[in-house]
Amino acid sequence: MALIVQKFGGSSVKDRDRIFNVARIVANTHNAGNDVVVVVSAQGDTTDDLIAKAAEISHDPSAREMDMLLATGEQISISLLSMALNEIGCHAISLTGWQAGFRTDRAYTKARITRLETERISSELERNRVVVVAGFQGLNKLDDITTLGRGGSDTSAVAIAAALHADRCQIFTDVEGVYTADPRKVRNTRKLEEITFDEMLELASLGAQVLNNRSVELAKKYNVELEVLSSLNPVPGTIVKEVVKDMEGMLIKGVAKDTDVAVITILNVPDEPGTSFKIFGLLA
């Protein structure tokens, strides 16, 4: 019997059909004799919709109240997925981030995990239940709800896998793995069978949307091997790990695009002490 952590993004649970598709994936894993912890994001564009609702009320809402609001998105997802699992005969229970034991610092909207108390998750697994956990959220020392920032559900999944010493951590997305470029934008890309943590971090920092860079950093720190898969097409994905055996030693593994980066060229700058400081000090 293996312990498997499975994470599903918002597009994987955006509607009824997708939720039942995820439920079948999870149930098949559990029915094969495995313990399963599932981490789920908010449905579809729920987080963006909640941000828009806040903007209708306040032009400058406090970070604490935003966390109270945004955390509700994942709670909808975990309850619906747990219902779907129970509906198809797979015993499941949903837990919020704080019920699952996530404790964080006080940096609202971009909190860092300080510890994970795994007793509740472990006790539910012992009862042969699938545990469905709300990603992206936790509780700080003031007992306030906090969120981990964009992509926080990936980080939640890796943290659970590390704390429970899981045998596998599977990240399900709407693509079939990590490609040499974004397959939704570039033709004839190639899926990578394996990629190192460092290579994945570089791609993530340059704008690749497959994995959140904080989750990869955490996976590297605790040596949690990741498997990136599609929730829509059951084919082998990409393994992200510390060392990759690559006989030919590819010089370039992938290409990513970041539209938020601009290049400014300044011509005819006088070669005088302090000139660069004056220019770049203003830009900074």
Predicted features and spans:
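Active-site proximal loops enriched in glycine and acidic residues that flank catalytic Cys/His/Asp
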Residues: 173, 228-230, 268
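Flexible, glycine/charged-enriched surface loops at secondary-structure junctions
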Residues: 34-38, 211-214, 225-231, 235, ...
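A broad, low-specificity signal marking well-ordered, structured residues that form hydrophobic/aromatic
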Residues: 131, 146, 226, 238, ...
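A conserved regulatory-domain signal marking ACT and ACT-like small-molecule sensing domains
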Residues: 237-284
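Terminal amphipathic helices with adjacent charged low-complexity linkers/tails
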Residues: 40-47, 228-247
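Nucleotide/pyrophosphate-binding catalytic subdomain
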Residues: 1-216
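Acidic-aromatic/histidine active-site loop/patch
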Residues: 219
